[in-house]
Each structure stands twice: as structure tokens, then as C-alpha cells.
Amino acid sequence: MGRKSAILAVILAIIYFRSNFSKMSNTPVQETEGPVYVAYSMEDMLKSPRDLYKSVKEVAKFVNSAEGKSMSARFKKFGTPREAMDFLAYGDAPTTPKTVPPVAPTEPNSPFSGVNRIQMNEFKKYVEKGDMENFLRLVDSNPRFLVNTGGDVASIVMEGFRYNALHIAAKAGQTEIIAKILELIQNIDFLIRLYGTGADDVTLRKINILDSYLNTPDKGNSDTPLHFASKFGKIGVVRVLTENSATDRTLLNKSGKSALDCAGERYTGEDKDMVQRDIHLAIEGFYVFLHRNPTTGSTQLTVSQKPPATYSTSPTTATVTVSAQAGPFFTEREARDFAKSWQTAGKELKRTDFDKGWERVGRVLAEQSEAMWRETWHFLGSMELLDLGSEQGLGVLEAFLREKRRGNLRNSEISEISTKKSIFRRGIHARKLDFGILDGEKSAEISENLTPDGSDSADDEDDDDIFYDTFSEIPAAAEKSINDPDDTLGSLTDRFAAISIFSPLPPPPPPQWSNSPNFDYSEGEDSFATPPTTPPPTFVADDEPCKIDNDLFEVLAQISSELISKFPLTQDYVQKLGKLTAHDRSTWRPIDSPARCDSRRKI
């Protein structure tokens, strides 16, 4: 009987261990059996049961049991039995390394506050009317009128249709406002001021801002600024927009139309056919570009419907730049014929005129072909292509000459003041006072440390702190002072009265109008007279003419007097240079000519 009981116990033990062994086996469990639940101990994973449960009810029953509560059991759901068994074997330790996502760079905080709706309505009014002065005033006070720094996109001016400033200006035909907006949002200094970061940061943002302005459709009919300009027949705006390589000319609105398809739809003028022709030419026309390497002087002509995607905007950092552009032409064949003529014509002129030979030849060919012509002028400080035969191009030149004139006047005034202040430019042998006379040391010593030309052999940097004895201006007094020094109090008082800072100038003669009965003596020494002055001559490079002046004059001389009269400084420049003969102007050397540089050094 005992033997039977032992055999029975062994059989039961084998059955029990086989059952538990199947649960602990590493044999893969069918994935179709999930999801499953497991109960585990929060305190010790080794004490966790290795049972898998099919439902929440089953696992919750164990967790709430006395055994589960004793081990502080919790349950967890898994998608497959394999995941559950891995958890029981390894706990929460990851089986594969997790990749840490890169930390996004912190967005800079603009030093400018946001623009409210009332301010934006005022801005919208100036854009619509083309009020450049007030437009620039607002943008200068807060660049966020133009840029939404939150997403590096164009600021929304009208919330309903989500118009940016280009939408509004294009619809109103404000070409100058559009050109100024595009100039500002591509200006690195403007963006650095807006974001408060560096050039590398804003260069990347500039791309997104420019694309947002040019190619963002409105919320109504999905029209871009180019759609608006084309639809309302604003040919000037169309040209400005298509000149930018970032403009996508193929975008379609909700009606499935491109900007070219919309040409003149809302235009009601009698010259509608001509306007549509010009719009077609601006959007679909072909251009001939002159590429120039300023270092080697090599040139290349290319034909394209769009300007080069990227080129340097600074003449100092340029590699290969676009120096000139002719067109647009209706067909690619016309453009290539023009390029062929440009390549073969005027070989002698191109060879002898390194700076503007190609441009001079192309300018003549463009006039003969009645094609638009634009070229760069490096002295303006940028690589922008300009048509000096247009009001926009002449406006840029006028602004440059105005600033140049101001600089010349300022330098002239500074030079005049410096000359008046400096005793050493008057040929006067003044004597530096030795203040030892106040201490009874060397009572009458006046050091004469002057060089033969009247300059002090000591440090000239401290001229502002040197006092001079102006008795030298009165020969009798000076001779008496040296031969018969007098240290009395009265003599010292007279000496101090004669002390002068800077140059020992004699008293100026009374003004001519001082005897007038209407002269106001109450102003005394605070009264100043401004004599009439002749502005110093203005040339584009410096205070002497150079070859650039002759090149510029040749272009300006072909412009109608009626147009150029709108720009007084430019008109004055042309009139003055026109008084010289062509032979005289042709002798002006290039600005970087060694002979010219050497002559300027001698001066």
C-alpha cells in the first residue's frame, strides 16, 4: 500500500512539474494568443509569478488576493506573450538602445514687441497709398510690421483673406513699395536687428521669409501676389516680382489658373492687349545674362527665363556675378540670336575696356533691338541690376549722389575747422607757455620747441591742452616781454589775458552789417554768420574724376532732359561733366589704376 502511494505521488509530481515547465519554457508562444496580462511584484521582480492571464478579471483576482497583496502586486498589459515573458525576465530594462532625439534649438526672442491690429491697419493704409516715408517710419520703428518672427514668415496684414504686404501692394500697383519690401527682407543687417542673432542664423531664415512673401496664396482664391499683379494689369509689379528667382510662376489658384492665365482679367484700360503682351513677356520671356568674374575678368553669356538662383549681393565678396541683363525676348531663339550678336560684336572695345566693354556693346545692341537693359554699377555698393533710363534707377543714383554730397560737405567743414584750430598750419611761430612762472621757477621761461615750419617738436596729439602766448602776434609787446620780463601781478594778468588755446588768431574784423541800424547787439559773441559756400565737386569715387565718371556720363547723356530734370543732383552732375570734351573725359584713369593711385598718394 505504501509503495502504491509513493508511485502515485511521483506521477502527480511529474504532472505538476511538466505543467509549470511548459510555462517557463523558452519555446516561442504563438503571437496570436495576445494580448495578455501579467502580475508582478513592485518590491522584487524575482518574486513575481510567471503566469499569463487572458483577461483583466483574471489578473485582478490574483492582485487582490492575499498572496498578491503580500507582494504589493500590480498588473500590466502586453501585446504578445513574448513581450510579457521578456518583462518578467528583464523588468523595465530596454532590450534595444533608445535613440535620443536631437534637442531643437531655442528660438531667439526678438527685441521688438508684436504689432497690434490698430497699428497694422495704419501700416496697410500706407502700403495701399504708396506712402514710402510713413511706410519706412513704421518699419524702422518695428521690423515686425514685415516679419512674423514666430514662424519666419510674412506678417499678415489683413486677417480675413490672410493678405501679406505684397498682396496689398500688388493689387494697388505700388511697385516701389514692393521693391523696398523685397530689399528689406533680404537685407542681412535688417534681419539681424529684427532677430538679435548673427548673420549665419538670419541667412537661413531669409530663405523662408522670402518664399513666404512671394509664393503664399491668399485664403480667398489662393492667389499669390503675382496673380494679383497679373490680374489687375500692374505690369511694373509683375516685372519686379518675376525678376526675383524665388518667385514660382507656375502656382495655380483655386480656379486652376496660373498668373499668366490671369493676365488682364480685371484690367479695363483701352490698351489691354498691350498690357497682356507685356505681362506675357515678363512671365514667359527669355533673358540674356552677362556673367563676369571680377578677379579674372572672364565673361560668359547665358539664356534663361529666370535670373540666377543665387549670386553675391556685395561687390567685395563676389565671385561670379551677373553684370548685365538684356530682355525679355518673346522666344528663346530671339534671345540666343541676341547673345550671338553680343558675343561677336565690338571685339576691340571689349579688349580695350576691361571694366565696361561688354556692357557698352550690349547697351547699344539692346537699344537697336528695343530690348530692356539693366546693368550693375559697383560704386553704388551693391550688385543690383539697374536701368538708369528709368525713374527707379535714377532714384537710386540720386540718393547716392545726395549722400556723397553730404559726405563731401562734412569732410570739407571738418578740414576747415581743423585748419582754423591748428596753430601749426598758419606758419606762426607761437611759443608754448611754461607755467613754472606761477611757482616762481624760471619766472620768464617760455620754451620755444617749434620746428622751422611752425610745428611743435613735442607730441602733437595734445594740441588741445597746449596754451600759447599770443604776445607774438603783437611785435612790440613780444619784444618788450622777452627783453624786459616783468613778474608783477599786473603783468601776469596781461599775460593770462593773452593766453589762447589752439591758434593765436588776431581778433576778427567786425562784420560788415555791424553798423546797420537793424543790427542786434544783444547776441554778442553768440552771433554767427554763414558765408555762402560752393559745394565741393562730387564724383562717384572720390574727389577726383575717374573712368567710372565717364562710363556713367555716357549712359546719362542719352536720357531725356525731361526725365533727368526730376533728379536735380543727377542733372547737375551731367551738366558739369558735359562741359568737358569727350577727349578730356576719355583720359580719366580707372579707379584702380596704379598711376592714379600713385598720384593720389603724392597729393
UniProtKB/Swiss-Prot annotation:
Pfam families assigned to the protein according to its UniProt record, in alphabetical order: ANKLE2_3rd
Q: How does it sit in the membrane?
A: Single-pass membrane protein
Q: Name one GO biological process term.
A: cell division
Q: Which SUPFAM superfamilies match?
A: Ankyrin repeat (SSF48403)
| ANK repeats: from-to residues | 161-190, 221-250
Give positions of region: Disordered. 446-465, 505-538
Cell location:
Nucleus membrane
- Which keywords annotate this record? ANK repeat, Cell cycle, Cell division, Membrane, Mitosis, Nucleus, Repeat, Transmembrane, Transmembrane helix
Q: Name one GO molecular function term.
A: protein phosphatase 2A binding
Q: Where is this chain compositionally biased, Acidic residues type? A: 456-465
Membrane-crossing residues?
2-22
The protein's matches in InterPro entries, at most eight in alphabetical order, are given as: ANKLE2_3rd, Ankyrin_rpt, Ankyrin_rpt-contain_sf
Subunit: Interacts with baf-1. Interacts with protein phosphatase 2A (PP2A) components.
Annotated family: Belongs to the ANKLE2 family.
Q: What is this protein called?
A: Ankyrin repeat and LEM domain-containing protein 2 homolog
Q: Which gene encodes it?
A: lem-4
